[in-house]
C-alpha cells in the first residue's frame, strides 16, 4: 500500500462538477492499493500517518502530528500510485489491486484512521473520475510505501 500525503490549507473532491467532500487545514492522503496488500499494511500505515510530525509547532519546526492537533483529513483512492514506467512510455498498472481487493482495503484504511484519530475522515469516491482541488501548505508532500519501510 502506498500513500502520498500532502499538507494542505484546504482540499476538496468533486464528481461530475458536484463537490462531495472538503476539508480545511489538514492532510490530503492519496491511497494506492497493491495486489499483495493486507491488514498489516493498513495497520503500519495508519500508525505512521497518525504519528507523522509534519505540522509546525509554535517555533515553526515540523514537530506536531495529526494526533496532536485538530486538523482535517481527506482520503482519496488512486490506483495510479502503483504505475510502472519501466518499459516503454505507457504506464502499466499491473501491480494495482483490482476493485474487489482494493475497495475493502481502502475502506479498511479509512476506518482504521478514523479509529486511530477519533474523527470522521472525508473521502473521495472509489473508482470514478474525480476532480481533486487543493492548496498546498509548505508545500509538504511525503510518499510512504508499506513495502519499502524507509
Predicted stretch roles:
Residues 1-88, 97, 103-150:
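N-terminal, polar/charged subdomain of small-to-medium soluble alpha/beta proteins
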Residues 93:
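Glycine-rich, phosphate-binding/catalytic loops in enzymes
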